[in-house]
């Protein structure tokens, strides 16, 4: 690869130094500053996901052929660098959210809000809006609870109940919240063609298929 081409590639995939500098100050930022930084991190992540989508590749797609050679249909170097940056920014975002929760709890304590730990977590989740998708819908069974909730194939999942990008634990927590809320509506936040959509999904066995949702969810 020519030096000029490499420099252009690096410019397209590197994290803005000013963003990196602000990330390093997460533990000293005020809550308002963290919310601005959260938006900027999410914007950068969306840009990276867009590049991967343009190449028709995800975070876990193979970059080599069955014979062990680099794929010729994707920019392997670019994808590798973007994946590395995405993982770094996801970790930074989790750190930011954890710090935000600490500051929110301190704020509520200072106001002498008397609530139990579960109620406080709910307040935290309402105060911080998660907009980064962490999974996508690869299949929806007709007539299923997911179908009735107007969930479509290729929709990206931002949150279901109180499960979001920062706490889904490899999608395991989705199963837990779904089982806990059988026959009770769950708020769902989706990303569809660049638009954030809200819907209500009621997990149920009262349909002709298997499972409580009738859809297949895969991690991004």
UniProtKB/Swiss-Prot annotation:
Keyword annotations of the record: Chaperone
Domain PDZ, chain residue ranges per copy: 119-196
GO biological process, one term: proteasome regulatory particle assembly
One Pfam family per UniProt: PDZ
Record-linked Gene3D superfamilies: 2.30.42.10, 6.10.140.1710
GO cellular component: cytoplasm; cytosol; nucleus
Membrane-crossing residue ranges in chain numbering: none
SUPFAM superfamilies for the chain: PDZ domain-like (SSF50156)
Misc note: Present with 846 molecules/cell in log phase SD medium.
Assigned protein family: Belongs to the proteasome subunit p27 family.
Subunit relationships: Part of a transient complex containing NAS2, RPT4 and RPT5 formed during the assembly of the 26S proteasome.
Function text: Acts as a chaperone during the assembly of the 26S proteasome, specifically of the base subcomplex of the 19S regulatory complex (RC). During the base subcomplex assembly is part of a NAS2:RPT4:RPT5 module; NAS2 is released during the further base assembly process.
Protein name as it appears in the record: Probable 26S proteasome regulatory subunit p27
Gene that encodes the chain: NAS2
